[in-house]
Swiss-Prot record:
Organism: Shewanella denitrificans (strain OS217 / ATCC BAA-1090 / DSM 15013)
Lineage of origin: Bacteria, Pseudomonadati, Pseudomonadota, Gammaproteobacteria, Alteromonadales
Entry keyword Transmembrane: yes
Protein name: Inner membrane-spanning protein YciB
Family as reported in the entry's similarity comment: Belongs to the YciB family.
GO CC list: plasma membrane
Name of the gene: yciB
Chain ranges passing through the membrane: 22-42, 50-70, 72-92, 118-138, 148-168
Length: 181
């Protein structure tokens, strides 16, 4: 259910965009993200920082989009969120406190240099996606950007996740058997 909740605002944004327009879709995105946060809080009694940052950015840039009737704001939101993620990953790695290791290190055992590579890889991935978003958002038609945002970036993220998991598994330390004498 949690994975569905992660995609709920995106699905609603896309559907409303296709049925109405970018401005109504932006309002729906703000509302859907607020509902997502509320459900996460009431069901799981916890809301991750990533969701809160995303909600804040959606609210700020969505409101600017609606107030100025200018879709450039909602287009920039994607790049800014990805930039913040890249910065957070880079800073965490520089401080030797990899966010990715903190999230996955209990389930997957790997050397710190593997976690560092994966962390830098994701930081570069987010920078690349942010740059690509700017290109698509401001060089191609709105319809293309919406499709890219919903399907392209989602597919790229899933592909990147698969690549990362395979890389970590390839270099993972074998589980130690606690029952061995």
């Amino acid at each position: 259910m949690k994975q569905l909740l992660d995609f709920l605002p995106l699905i609603i944004f896309f559907t409303v965009y296709k049925l109405v327009d970018i401005y109504t879709a932006t309002g729906a995105l703000i509302a859907a993200t607020a509902v997502q946060i509320a459900i996460l809080y009431f069901v799981y009694k916890k809301v991750e920082k990533m969701h809160l940052v995303t909600f804040a950015m959606v609210t700020v840039f969505g409101t600017l989009t609606l107030a100025f009737h200018d879709d450039a704001f909602i287009k920039w939101k994607v790049t800014i969120i990805y930039s913040l993620f890249a910065i957070a990953l880079a800073v965490s790695q520089i401080m030797n406190k990899s966010i990715i290791k903190a999230m996955l290190g209990k389930e997957l055992k790997a050397d710190d240099n593997i976690w560092a590579r994966v962390t830098w890889y994701w930081a570069l991935f987010f920078i690349g996606c942010g740059v690509l978003n700017v290109y698509v958002a401001f060089s191609l038609p709105l319809e293309t950007w919406v499709n890219f945002k919903v399907f392209g970036l989602t597919a790229l993220t899933l592909l990147n996740t698969v690549i990362s998991v395979f890389y970590i598994y390839k270099h993972a330390q074998p589980e130690q058997d606690d029952t061995a004498n």
